[in-house]
């Protein structure tokens, strides 16, 4: 929570500096069947972190969001200042800003580490030698393939499918500000309002099957599409007959617990392995960058949950 809050401040600073409005303050609505232990911990964490939020009961929720079928939902948290980062364009903005500040950006495939101990350099498959004092590898779902000898059984890349539904012409109920970004806790489903006329987004947060990110099909499956249609019809009745106008297939990249991985390569102490971002690593990017830099420079204590030693070969998801 602290990292998310800190990162949003830095994302906004970047977007202001590059003059690109890549954050939509839609608000985020967290929905749950009832107020239990997990909900209490969430409220306490938000309070400690100074995050602005309000609590809604069933009646308040139904009155505020009549377009949502709130059956069996008796508790909700609304964060008015949260929202949606436009990921692809934000990454491009980071690269452009880094170039302006003197960084180099290259697209290349590296070969294996060529020597024991500290890695002095890496050779790309094109024959270029890249030398540095420290190397950081944040390869997402490909991290387990790039360092298969260490991470093949510790990184779990799963198939995740996303769908966008058309909204009725002239109907603003499914666009911000009438519709916030939302998440149903027990259903493990989340979505976003219609942004930039792309449609109403829905995705399932359950982990899909383990896949190879290089070879998995990028076409959405009929089964997942039908699951999305069924859910939308139940929770958002006005979209019951709306067509799917776009679909995407991507990956989550999890460790056994769902915690991040930030640690040295066990055989090459100047090579850092950074991963386990799941579906939320991007939004934590600024805080993660600060932490990794602090680790390399020896300026911040290591978080035990991020260590390589804490990762197991069997998934026991604890972080969502």
Predicted regions and their residues:
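Short loop/edge segments at beta-strand edges and connector loops
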Residues: 57-58, 106-109, 246
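Active-site substrate-recognition segment that forms the wall
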Residues: 13, 19-24, 134, 141-270
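Dinucleotide-binding Rossmann-like beta1-alpha1 core, especially the glycine-rich loop
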Residues: 1-64, 73, 188
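Helical element adjacent to the flavin cofactor pocket in flavoenzyme catalytic cores
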Residues: 78-126, 130-134
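C-terminal catalytic lobe of FAD-dependent flavoproteins
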Residues: 231-320
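Short beta-strand to alpha-helix junction loop
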Residues: 2, 30-38, 77-96, 217-224, ...
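A short, glycine/Asx- and small/polar-enriched loop/turn
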Residues: 38, 67-73, 114-121, 254-258, ...
């Amino acid at each position: 929570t602290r990292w998310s809050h800190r990162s949003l401040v830095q994302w906004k600073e970047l977007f202001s500096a590059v003059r690109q409005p890549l954050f939509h303050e839609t608000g985020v609505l967290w929905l749950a069947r009832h107020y239990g232990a997990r909900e209490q911990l969430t409220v306490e964490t938000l309070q400690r972190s100074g995050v602005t939020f309000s609590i809604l009961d069933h009646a308040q929720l139904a009155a505020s969001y009549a377009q949502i079928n709130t059956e069996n939902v008796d508790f909700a948290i609304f964060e008015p200042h949260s929202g949606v980062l436009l990921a692809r364009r934000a990454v491009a903005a980071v690269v452009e800003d880094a170039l302006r500040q003197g960084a180099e950006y290259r697209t290349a495939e590296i070969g294996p580490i060529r020597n024991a101990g500290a890695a002095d350099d890496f050779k790309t498959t094109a024959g270029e030698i890249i030398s540095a004092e420290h190397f950081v590898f944040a390869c997402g779902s490909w991290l387990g393939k790039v360092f298969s000898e260490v991470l093949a059984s510790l990184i779990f890349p799963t198939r995740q499918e996303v769908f966008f539904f058309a909204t009725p012409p002239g109907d603003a109920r499914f666009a911000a500000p009438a519709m916030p970004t939302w998440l149903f806790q027990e259903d493990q489903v989340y979505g976003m309002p219609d942004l930039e006329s792309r449609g109403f987004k829905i995705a399932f947060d359950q982990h899909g099957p383990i896949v190879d990110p290089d070879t998995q099909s990028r076409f959405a499956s009929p089964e997942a599409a039908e699951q999305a249609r069924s859910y939308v019809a139940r929770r958002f009745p006005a979209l019951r007959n709306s067509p799917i106008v776009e679909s995407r297939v991507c990956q989550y990249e999890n460790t056994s617990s769902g915690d991040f991985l930030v640690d040295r390569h066990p055989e090459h102490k100047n090579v850092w392995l950074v991963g386990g971002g799941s579906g939320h690593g991007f939004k934590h990017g600024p805080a993660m960058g600060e932490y990794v830099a602090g680790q390399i420079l020896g300026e911040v204590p290591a978080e035990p949950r991020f260590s390589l030693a804490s990762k197991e070969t069997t998934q026991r998801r604890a972080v969502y």
